[in-house]
Amino acid sequence: MEPGNYTVVTEFILLGLTDDITVSVILFVMFLIVYSVTLMGNLNIIVLIRTSPQLHTPMYLFLSHLAFLDIGYSSSVTPIMLRGFLRKGTFIPVAGCVAQLCIVVAFGTSESFLLASMAYDRYVAICSPLLYSTQMSSTVCILLVGTSYLGGWVNAWIFTGCSLNLSFCGPNKINHFFCDYSPLLKLSCSHDFSFEVIPAISSGSIIVVTVFIIALSYVYILVSILKMRSTEGRQKAFSTCTSHLTAVTLFFGTITFIYVMPQSSYSTDQNKVVSVFYTVVIPMLNPLIYSFRNKEVKEAMKKLIAKTHWWS
């Protein structure tokens, strides 16, 4: 492209989910409620785990960090999406767009590593219960949590580095409700295929590794459960894994669709729907999944409510 034949883009316009005013109002109210439930649910999980001695175990340490990541994940996307419902087109500078992408990828990738760590925790608890206190010591737990965050930011910097090297010299309207990498790539006038391949390889590798760890952990867990003679023991083991398996299926099913499958295999509208699910809906569902199906969490909640009521 000849110099001077294009205008350098300095800001983008997020088109959002819909142009219809009535639909926008309905979606604004709906997602405001979803975001409020997300914040309250995840904050409640964090406070509950921090204030309940019976929940001071590795599993609930991971769960508290999962709640923190869900708050960050949702908060990096939902507020700007809500603003988009109130005004036609949301303006965002290029630097702000790249920053949002970086934060979204960091929180999302950290969550995948954390879910793998939680699967390993369940494997040790069920398959080697006598060694649990040594194999899941505080040092090991801190290392697993720290590695999850580190892995998230490394992947985020890969996406950030590629996006900073993209050139934007034409349309600046992003047909999305946040700055995701795929819509940015479609607007770019750069023709370097590596900018599409490198993030896909990075995300794909992380998904393969984390899913492999989760799958291998649950294969061993299943074998151990089938060897149990006690029906009550089997039910208890299954119940501790059901919530995590549900969260894993929802999370990895959606991010695989977006970050691994070729862009030509899905439309922009499909991208939007799936993106809403994994950035807005799943962070709301996780605390509900872990609360309703977990006796220890429900008991800790009852004690906290009773204590609060007594002090009042």
UniProtKB/Swiss-Prot annotation:
<feature type="transmembrane region" description="Helical; Name=1">
    <location>
        <begin position="26"/>
        <end position="46"/>
    </location>
</feature>
<feature type="transmembrane region" description="Helical; Name=5">
    <location>
        <begin position="197"/>
        <end position="217"/>
    </location>
</feature>
<feature type="transmembrane region" description="Helical; Name=4">
    <location>
        <begin position="134"/>
        <end position="154"/>
    </location>
</feature>
<feature type="topological domain" description="Cytoplasmic">
    <location>
        <begin position="121"/>
        <end position="133"/>
    </location>
</feature>
<feature type="topological domain" description="Extracellular">
    <location>
        <begin position="155"/>
        <end position="196"/>
    </location>
</feature>
<dbReference type="GO" id="GO:0004984">
    <property type="term" value="F:olfactory receptor activity"/>
</dbReference>
<keyword id="KW-0807">Transducer</keyword>
<dbReference type="GO" id="GO:0007608">
    <property type="term" value="P:sensory perception of smell"/>
</dbReference>
<dbReference type="GO" id="GO:0016020">
    <property type="term" value="C:membrane"/>
</dbReference>
<comment type="similarity">
    <text>Belongs to the G-protein coupled receptor 1 family.</text>
</comment>
<keyword id="KW-1003">Cell membrane</keyword>
<keyword id="KW-0472">Membrane</keyword>
<keyword id="KW-1133">Transmembrane helix</keyword>
<feature type="transmembrane region" description="Helical; Name=7">
    <location>
        <begin position="272"/>
        <end position="292"/>
    </location>
</feature>
<dbReference type="InterPro" id="IPR017452">
    <property type="entry name" value="GPCR_Rhodpsn_7TM"/>
</dbReference>
<dbReference type="GO" id="GO:0005886">
    <property type="term" value="C:plasma membrane"/>
</dbReference>
<keyword id="KW-0297">G-protein coupled receptor</keyword>
<comment type="function">
    <text>Probable odorant receptor, which recognizes only aliphatic alcohols, suggesting that it may convey a 'woody' or 'sweet' sour.</text>
</comment>
<feature type="topological domain" description="Extracellular">
    <location>
        <begin position="76"/>
        <end position="99"/>
    </location>
</feature>
<feature type="topological domain" description="Extracellular">
    <location>
        <begin position="1"/>
        <end position="25"/>
    </location>
</feature>
<feature type="disulfide bond">
    <location>
        <begin position="97"/>
        <end position="189"/>
    </location>
</feature>
<feature type="transmembrane region" description="Helical; Name=6">
    <location>
        <begin position="238"/>
        <end position="258"/>
    </location>
</feature>
<dbReference type="Pfam" id="PF13853">
    <property type="entry name" value="7tm_4"/>
</dbReference>
<keyword id="KW-0552">Olfaction</keyword>
<dbReference type="GO" id="GO:0004930">
    <property type="term" value="F:G protein-coupled receptor activity"/>
</dbReference>
<dbReference type="GO" id="GO:0007186">
    <property type="term" value="P:G protein-coupled receptor signaling pathway"/>
</dbReference>
<feature type="transmembrane region" description="Helical; Name=2">
    <location>
        <begin position="55"/>
        <end position="75"/>
    </location>
</feature>
<feature type="topological domain" description="Cytoplasmic">
    <location>
        <begin position="47"/>
        <end position="54"/>
    </location>
</feature>
<feature type="glycosylation site" description="N-linked (GlcNAc...) asparagine">
    <location>
        <position position="165"/>
    </location>
</feature>
<keyword id="KW-0325">Glycoprotein</keyword>
<feature type="topological domain" description="Extracellular">
    <location>
        <begin position="259"/>
        <end position="271"/>
    </location>
</feature>
<feature type="topological domain" description="Cytoplasmic">
    <location>
        <begin position="218"/>
        <end position="237"/>
    </location>
</feature>
<keyword id="KW-0812">Transmembrane</keyword>
<keyword id="KW-0716">Sensory transduction</keyword>
<keyword id="KW-1015">Disulfide bond</keyword>
<dbReference type="InterPro" id="IPR000276">
    <property type="entry name" value="GPCR_Rhodpsn"/>
</dbReference>
<feature type="transmembrane region" description="Helical; Name=3">
    <location>
        <begin position="100"/>
        <end position="120"/>
    </location>
</feature>
<feature type="topological domain" description="Cytoplasmic">
    <location>
        <begin position="293"/>
        <end position="312"/>
    </location>
</feature>
<keyword id="KW-0675">Receptor</keyword>
<dbReference type="InterPro" id="IPR000725">
    <property type="entry name" value="Olfact_rcpt"/>
</dbReference>
<feature type="glycosylation site" description="N-linked (GlcNAc...) asparagine">
    <location>
        <position position="5"/>
    </location>
</feature>
<protein>
    <recommendedName>
        <fullName>Olfactory receptor 5p57</fullName>
    </recommendedName>
</protein>
